[in-house]
Amino acid sequence: MGLEQPNNAAVEATSSTTSKLVFIRSRADYASFPCNDEAAVLADPTAAILVIGNEILSGKVADENARYLIGELRRLGVSLRRIEVIPDVVGEIAARVRALADTVDHLFTSGGVGPTHDDVTLEAVGEAFGMPIARNAELEGLLRNGYGPRLQERDLRMADIPVGARLEHGPGALGATWPVVVVRNVWVLPGVPSIFRRKFEAVRELFRAPPIHGRALYSRAGEGEIAGALDETVAQFAAAGVEVGSYPHLDAADYRVKITIDGRDPAAVDRALAFLAERLGDAVAKTE
């Protein structure tokens, strides 16, 4: 099918889950993209993760969801900009949701969506955007069908969501039975790791973007000795969107520093690696 590209700023790509993905370079064009059979995807999307729960901050429960999502977003081509962990306090959650949602394209929350007294995330997200909370008929029906005679009134709290939120089913298997609540660009996910993963997997293809390419160089010289070459590489390739990371490895047998070079343009990444390797000379232990 045909497609009119907003301001000639879109790039088409095919996907196994949609008839066509359209990568949008301009966020203004992304916001105004028409709703049709094509799926608009930002060419350079950013994300943040907000982990919510007193149990995480107290050390009673180890967070697994942020670590999982870091890897998934990387594989999808989404640049993660921030991770925060905050308590089950409505005002604090609302403030951080409001602030983070304004700085990234996708904000994922983890935790606080069950039927108990400390499950206040949806209330807080509603407060963040000035949206009242009301019972959603579709979610109530899913709860009644899922719980059957075991359903208690408090369980229906999980159907109380901000007015104006949308239910995103996604192409994955779980999406057909239990949707993800989305408020603007905030994706509200549960804290239980197994359910978090299943729900994200149902919608993960909605976030696919052009891949982030990565190379690595291992240096026999320490960071102090290679800092000048790193500075040169950063200055030379920053305009091409290349990011350089330097990570000492004190216990490695054959190198002292691992240097990563990442970017969306694979040719630029390769040029940056060659540029740095030339400056380090015999200090290069290996590249990959």
Please place each PLM-identified region on the residue numbering:
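Glycine-rich beta-strand-to-loop/alpha-helix junction loops that act as flexible
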Residues: 52-54, 109-117, 191, 247, ...
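Low-acidity, Ser/Thr- and Arg-rich intrinsically disordered low-complexity segments
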Residues: 14-19, 25-26
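Conserved short beta-strand edge segments in small beta-sheet-based binding/regulatory domains
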Residues: 280-288
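N-terminal small/polar loop signature for handling phosphorylated ligands or for N-terminal nucleophile
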Residues: 67-127
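Proline/glycine-rich low-complexity loops and linkers
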Residues: 92-95, 119-209
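Residue-level detector of structural "landmarks"
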Residues: 4-6
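ATP/NTP phosphate-donor binding region
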Residues: 33, 41-91
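An accessory alpha-helical subdomain
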Residues: 184-279
